Amino acid sequence: MKILLVHNRYRSTAPSGENRVVDQEREALATLGHDVRLFERQSDEIEEWPAWKKATLPARVIWNPTTKRDLSVELREFQPDVVHVHNTFPVLSPSVLYACRDAGVPVVITLHNYKLLCASGDFYREGSVCHDCAGGNPLPAVRNSCYRGSKLATATTVLNTRSHRRTWQNLVSAYLFISESQRTLLAGMDFDADRSFVRYNYVPYDGPVIDPAAKDPRRQVTYVGRLDAAKGAPLLMKGWDAYRAIAGDDALQLAIAGGGPMLDEVTAWAADRPSVQLRGMLGKPDIFSLIGESRAVVLPSEWEETFGLVVVEAMAVGVPLLASAHGSFRELVTDGVDGALFDPGRPDELAKLLLDVDACPDKYVDLGRNARTTYETTHDPQSNLQQLLDVYRFAVANPVPSR
């Protein structure tokens, strides 16, 4: 099958799981013998634009004639069987869907976030989950300057999604949601249910797995991810302090891998706490290695995650999760089976779980064994890719009519 992936990469200063998913799937599909190409643009390129071109960005977000023209050329030359769109914001724009329509090529789109209904893409505002725009009315987003703290930037983002609502509904042959909880929260888009599918993100792993029979010397838990409020950095710090206040000095260690807007705050906090180690930004092999050194992985997200690559990465290694009990985490992690869930509004609940992790190592070895089983049964890479190919075949067999 000839497959063209279309993706607008996020800024290099804000590493994205979406970028990783695109790269991993491209490599895997090519390994299976498919002819795969990637049509992409970089958000970083905006910084290099001349002033006059930057001034046109609000209009280009909504309709970029240059990318439509360039993609049309690629479609004529490559003649793919299917186009798989990931992200079109901000450089590509929904104009790419019209290029595909004009070329008569069916489109599959993966919805990685909540951007079509939420200007910030995460249903999170001022430290709390927010569903004010979930019904389809975007005015609260503009009123609250939800995108980059700017009413103008928010209005541009909202205008893009609202003006192309029928584009998303009429020019896409198949929609891929990355969790059932995400599909539920995006119900306000009124997508055709017959063309909507849930497919978890692809996470390949062929490295070492924790040996449940081995003695468990690990007295460490790990956080891997972006350091910001939505990802739960404040909750992590409060929960850790509450735990150490009870446990004292002879207790677990905390390893933190990642960067982000709260890096300086987390660094200052960790400086006074010998039990906390900052590992910085790590590549994928080092992330898996760090997870393997841990008794559990902590996921304290305060926003309702659409997925969570770290969940599956930990399961692949055989390490259980301590995760916030909302969003996709309630779907991915089964409390008491392959991890434990806690109220994201309760740092004391996280502290109690950390006490349990240290006091009951055998229990968490068992949870880790179950986590690995979950990976093998629910997140098997080959089954995941087969599901993706089935959706491609569906799109080819059921193209939307030109309108």
Predicted regions and their residues:
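Membrane-proximal helix-turn-helix segments that form the acceptor-binding/catalytic region
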Residues: 102, 115, 131-174, 184
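Conserved acidic donor-binding segment of nucleotide-sugar-dependent glycosyltransferases
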Residues: 335-336, 340-347, 356-361
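Carbohydrate-associated surface elements
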Residues: 181, 202
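Acidic donor-binding loop of glycosyltransferase active sites
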Residues: 292-306, 319
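Nucleotide-activated donor-binding/catalytic signature segment of Leloir-type glycosyltransferases, i.e.
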Residues: 264-285, 289
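Short glycine-rich donor-binding/catalytic loop of glycosyltransferases
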Residues: 302, 319, 323-330, 344-345
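Conserved donor-binding/catalytic core segment of Leloir-type glycosyltransferases
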Residues: 207, 212-241
